[in-house]
Amino acid sequence: MEANGSQGTSGSANDSQHDPGKMFIGGLSWQTSPDSLRDYFSKFGEIRECMVMRDPTTKRSRGFGFVTFADPASVDKVLGQPHHELDSKTIDPKVAFPRRAQPKMVTRTKKIFVGGLSANTVVEDVKQYFEQFGKVEDAMLMFDKTTNRHRGFGFVTFENEDVVEKVCEIHFHEINNKMVECKKAQPKEVMFPPGTRGRARGLPYTMDAFMLGMGMLGYPNFVATYGRGYPGFAPSYGYQFPGFPAAAYGPVAAAAVAAARGSGSNPARPGGFPGANSPGPVADLYGPASQDSGVGNYISAASPQPGSGFGHGIAGPLIATAFTNGYH
């Protein structure tokens, strides 16, 4: 059978729950069919489902597939064999794990991001301005540790979430004769989903290229501050990039992590910002989740992620100055 970019011999691919008997098979030959894949792995145990993923347009194999054993012990047998070859090509079987759901964007919050502040604006100016909308619990500006000058952006926390709605509805505000932009602050979990946060500490100097690519020249180094783990920043927050869909946060974070690992910049893209079609995590590289609701929720264990095209950052560490001293 052939449907939704896959070709299999039995079973259903619509079950997104983790199946301990399910394996991701990478490195398949273009000639490998579900039948030949089944024939090879049947020597390890009874196979409940077998499929080769295909491009929905060209119908060509995408070079990977899935095999689900009736007995999870068969997976150990496969992994216990150091070398696997099928159709004169070395293949790479791995345990398939469900892909975690991406955190949703926060719609109700007490904290806002304020960007585009003038150089002479101090934290008291920011607090005084926003108090006209409601009680301010805290206000802070982000400072460069080297120059001890603020970088043109900060955060304000209100006592009431409704105040945030009112402030962000206006969007642009004038403080000290300069228009500033206000956005809802987003938890770090949105910026760096679980599994990438451990490497997020390496991002400050690689994400600058991304920030510049998004046109955020007015307040660079934002991610260098939030996600750096400075004392008192609990929870950390990120800025909701203008015009950037929430669904894209996962691939961007993955690409940034790949950049932190040492990927070079993309010479075809000035500023180091990846193209619109740059691949995301391995599941996106092999095909969008929409092709198959069950398969799209799986990734292979320890499979590499593609490079991102992010360049190196340009600025140094930041520190925060807050209206209250709870952040120092």
From Swiss-Prot:
Phosphorylated. Ubiquitinated by the RHOBTB2-CUL3-RBX1 ubiquitin ligase complex. The modification Omega-N-methylarginine is found at R228, R261. The modification Phosphoserine is found at S6. The modification N-acetylmethionine is found at M1. Its main location: cytoplasm. It comes from the Eukaryota. Induction: Up-regulated in astrocytes after brain injury. The record marks L217, G218 as: Breakpoint for translocation to form MSI2/HOXA9 fusion protein. It is found in: Cytoplasm. GO terms for molecular function: identical protein binding; mRNA binding; poly(U) RNA binding; RNA binding. Residues 1-15 have a biased composition (Polar residues). The keyword Protein biosynthesis does not apply. Residues 21-111, 110-187 form the RRM domain. PROSITE patterns: RRM (PS50102). It holds the Pfam family RRM_1. RNA binding protein that regulates the expression of target mRNAs at the translation level. May play a role in the proliferation and maintenance of stem cells in the central nervous system. Belongs to the Musashi family. This is RNA-binding protein Musashi homolog 2. It comes from Homo sapiens.
